[in-house]
């Protein structure tokens, strides 16, 4: 990352390039959330149409497994490419690929030709794109601002990400219910154009020192080495993995089943439930922006308590309002924890390693999610979904608090003398 003197526009916050990128990302992410909600709903319909309800949990998780396995194989390459090459071009190429996937699935839905294997194959192809997109997207934000504004920029980026959840799922619920699920995919394809335009206007990263440029050409293992040696970063990656194992499958994989089977919700009501989750996520992101570093550990512990309580509440909910309020609480807790974890990891990452460190942090999500999703889906097929939610709360509490008790006292984001050089 360049210094403020090398990047004058970054001396003020927010600057022009950062704002343009945020606008483009906001439009694109709204489309992505629309497609995500429609995808989960379409899978429930296809499973019911093909008489595969006995395997609904596993089939809901199968696309995530396909995507996650591909990303697990390619994430090191994606992180290295983000450090070595122009992140703008990497992101633009990924947008083009995702436009093609969205249009293809939309056409299959429109012609009534969609089957479960189409969704699984498309997810695997999207995994290739995401392997390169995620590290580049995470690493480009700190390059657009001065070093002292990195935490603010990451908080705004997370707030935009979560704010789109207020619009995307609700809009998708309306489109699916009124016009058909294919329109969520078509509009998602169109939304990528906004981000491509924004990326085209961003300045190139100024060259670093000779030493920094040499380090950018290093191996993918440098990211692992940094995280392993820096205890606060390691703690945050461990907490991200804990969320992936016990919380994200509930939000990403099991929510369509929960809404359709347990709450008897319509597509529009499913969209409103996701809107509740988005509202909580935005609230958590805004909290992070106003949080002093000294309060980070307390905020993480509070977020864990909120998330555990919300999972228990969801396991008992009997109506949409109850479930919606539980999702708000769950999202506040999770977004606070995940946002702080990503901020701390990015703050402590050397500029020349940021792409590879971002890939390691991303691994704690996409590396564990496919297996967690399959296990959760399988357990949902064997036991009642509500029992799975309760079990997730217990496991999340035990492992999460254990991590915080052992290494969580050093999560202020400040560099300690013994790790500053790592």
Put a short name on every predicted segment.
Residues 61-66, 73, 77, 84, ...:
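C-terminal transmembrane bundle of multi-pass solute transporters/carriers
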Residues 17-37, 63-101, 118-177, 236, ...:
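Substrate-agnostic recognition of the 12-TM MFS/MFS-like secondary transporter fold
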Residues 38-71:
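Extracellular/periplasmic helix-loop-helix junction of adjacent transmembrane segments
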Residues 139-144, 181, 185-214, 404-418:
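Helix-loop junctions on the cytosolic side of multi-pass membrane transporters
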Residues 38-49, 106-111, 167-187, 261-262, ...:
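Transmembrane alpha-helix termini and helix-breaking/packing motifs in multi-pass membrane transporters
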Residues 40, 102-109, 172, 176, ...:
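Structural signal for membrane-spanning alpha-helices in multi-pass inner-membrane proteins
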């Amino acid at each position: 990352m360049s210094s403020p003197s090398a990047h004058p526009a970054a001396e003020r916050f927010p600057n022009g390039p950062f704002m343009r990128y945020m606008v483009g990302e906001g439009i694109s992410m709204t489309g992505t959330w629309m497609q995500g909600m429609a995808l989960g709903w379409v899978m429930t319909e296809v499973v019911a149409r093909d008489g595969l309800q006995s395997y609904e949990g596993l089939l809901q998780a199968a696309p995530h497994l396909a995507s996650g396995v591909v990303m697990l194989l390619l994430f090191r390459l994606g992180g290295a490419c983000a450090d070595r090459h122009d992140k703008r071009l990497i992101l633009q190429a990924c947008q083009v690929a995702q436009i093609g996937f969205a249009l293809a699935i939309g056409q299959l839905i429109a012609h009534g030709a969609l089957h479960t294997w189409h969704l699984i194959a498309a997810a695997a192809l999207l995994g290739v794109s995401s392997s390169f997109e995620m590290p580049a997207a995470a690493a480009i934000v700190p390059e657009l601002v001065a070093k002292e504004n990195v935490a603010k920029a990451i908080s705004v980026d997370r707030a935009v990400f979560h704010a789109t959840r207020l619009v995307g799922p609700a809009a998708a619920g309306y489109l699916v219910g009124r016009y058909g699920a294919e329109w969520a995919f078509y509009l998602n394809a169109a939304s990528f154009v906004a981000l491509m335009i924004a990326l085209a206007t961003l300045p190139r990263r100024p060259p670093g020192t000779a030493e920094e440029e040499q380090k950018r050409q290093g191996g993918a293992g440098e990211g692992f080495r940094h995280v392993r040696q820096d205890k606060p970063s390691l703690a945050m990656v461990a907490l991200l993995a804990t969320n992936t194992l016990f919380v994200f499958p509930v939000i990403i994989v099991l929510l369509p089943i929960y809404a359709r089977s347990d709450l008897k919700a319509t597509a529009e009501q499913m969209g409103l439930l996701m809107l509740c989750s988005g509202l909580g996520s935005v609230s958590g992101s805004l909290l992070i922006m106003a949080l002093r570093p000294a309060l980070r550990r307390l905020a993480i512990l509070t977020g864990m308590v909120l998330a555990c309580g919300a999972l228990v509440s969801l396991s008992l909910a009997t109506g949409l309002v109850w479930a919606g309020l539980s999702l708000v609480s769950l999202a506040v807790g999770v977004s606070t924890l995940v946002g702080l974890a990503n901020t701390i990891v990015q703050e402590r990452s050397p500029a020349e390693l940021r792409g590879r460190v971002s890939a390691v942090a991303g691994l704690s999500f996409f590396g564990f999610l496919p297996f967690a999703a399959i296990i959760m889906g399988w357990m949902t097929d064997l036991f009642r979904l509500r029992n799975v939610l309760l079990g997730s709360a217990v496991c999340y509490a035990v492992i999460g608090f254990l991590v915080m008790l052992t290494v969580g006292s050093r999560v202020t984001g400040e560099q300690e003398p013994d790790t500053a050089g790592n």
